[in-house]
Amino acid sequence: MDMKAADIGAHAKFVLHGPEEEFDPRITAHRGDLADVALAGKMFAPHYAVPMPMRCSAPKAMLRKHSGKDHEAISELLHGEDFHVLDIAGDWAWGYCGHDGYVGYVPVHALQHEKKTPVPTHLIFARAALIFMEPDFKSGVMKRLPMGARIACGEASECGNFLKTGKGFVHVRHVQPIGTKVVFDGTNGTAALAEQLIGAPYLWGGRSGDGLDCSGLIQMILMLTGVDAPRDSDQQLAVLGEEIAEGEALRRGDLVFFPDHVGLMIDKDRIIHANSHMMQVTIEPLADTIARFAKTSDKPVLARKRLS
């Protein structure tokens, strides 16, 4: 295993500075036998590892709770996203995602060392983008990348319609520079992006245009508008937006949180969300969604929040 050894050298020693802190296992790289060296002094582990900086080179790769393709998917790594590897065993790498700190296992074959891959400059902004062999939509297709994937783009083609990316070309209408900001107002872009995904299959752990869960949808469309968001709905509830006053009407782009669920308003009455009831991304009256949650919860709506 071509990594810095787990215990950072034979003579490395670490001392806990007081009691171990409480931690969220979803975003804390601690496995019992091994932990990120950044946790040394905060949490005990028999060994600590310096993360190896890797990057997803596959179109996408599921992040799993345990090594093995039959284990539960907990999130998804998209092309061009960073993954910090702490251990490799067989075909699986254990570590955490660079964009949100989520911890899990991904297939080794989906990763390359970041030194061997160009730094991404653009995001796939369409539901999916094709990488063509030539700057011509009639040419052969090299690969298909989902919404949210990151690529390194170079100079424009002579016609101005394509950007060079690796050995291929991507249409300019399908990408935007990383970090592009969107102003949140009554016509904000989050809802328009979500509407592109109507009919996309519900996929537990998914966060791409090919399949996604409720919080994956919210995280991805916010990322595309230049806003960092955590992975799960409870994490998003804690940090995103401001509470909307009771009695104030909802508007396009507002977030509504339910028990273990989140959706985005497309107007004052209707919500778009990836849901397991319809097993896809759908638009429906907010009242219908609330009625379903009211069957199993005394508090079907946890919060209504507005991004600013």
Provide a role label for each language-model segment:
Residues 293-308:
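Low-complexity, Gly/Ser/Thr/Pro-rich intrinsically disordered linker/tail segments
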Residues 58-68, 124-136, 233-244:
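Short, structured beta-strand/loop micro-motifs enriched in basic residues and often containing a Trp
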Residues 80, 142-153, 252-253:
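Loop/turn positions that initiate beta-strands
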Residues 227-287:
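...with weaker cross-activation on analogous glycine-rich loops/strands in unrelated enzymes
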Residues 194, 206-225, 229-230:
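Active-site nucleophilic cysteine motif
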Residues 56, 85, 153, 257-258:
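A generic structural signal for residues embedded in beta-strands
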Residues 1-52, 68, 75, 79-90, ...:
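Boundary regions of SH3-family modules and the immediately adjacent low-complexity/disordered segments
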Residues 72-73, 140-141, 240, 246:
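Short, conserved secondary-structure segments in the cores of folded domains
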